Amino acid sequence: EVNPHFIYNTLNSIRWMATIQHAPGIAEMVTAFARLTKSISKGTQKLVPLQEELALLNDYFTIQQYRYGGDLEIEVSRIEDDRLCRDCMIPRFTLQPLVENAIFHGLEPKGGHGSVLLDISTDPATGDVLLRLTDDGVGMPPEQVAHLLDEPAEGAEKAEKFRHVGLWNVNRRIRYSFGEGYGLTIESEEDVGTEVTIRLPYQQKGDSHAADTACGR
């Protein structure tokens, strides 16, 4: 097993070499990748403030932007209240796999160009936090959407199973952390796009219920 410090030191060396060779793009991408790698090493069960999750998403986008150039847009289109980003807790690496799905299964089939927009608001009826990820990709038929959150079948095609596992796992982690009333809902229309809504409780860092449910109590 490779020592994580060796990986981080190597990435820092690459960043330093890129800087002195006046290659800012490489330096920026390596910096983003190093931060993502450190976050991955911390695991996915821990609850983090939404603003920390958004920072991870920004690092992921930095890397993908260099891959796709100006053809890809990922943007937080609206934040209803800045306090949501500071106070709302979310399982680490919830947004990144959903955005990855939107890119590889929604935008790539139409040439890798398009947008993924994130809207952050509250449900006026319940006070829950709603994160809506909308892409303008190829979309999906209703019969496919209906089973996306089911537990993946063993015989599924590799690419579809990868997508299915990612969505199912994110939904499972949210429900494990907060209860069955929370998680993902998915709406999609072929040739129009897909919207994934994440429902979370509005609970601040250190909230006893969030801590209890995260520990399975």
Where are these regions (language model features)?
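Two-component histidine phosphotransfer core
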Residues: E1-E187, E195
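C-terminal coupling/interaction segments
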Residues: Y202-A210
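Intrinsically disordered, low-complexity acidic/proline-/asparagine-rich linker or regulatory tail/stalk regions
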Residues: A210-R217
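Short C-terminal beta-strand
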Residues: T194-Q203
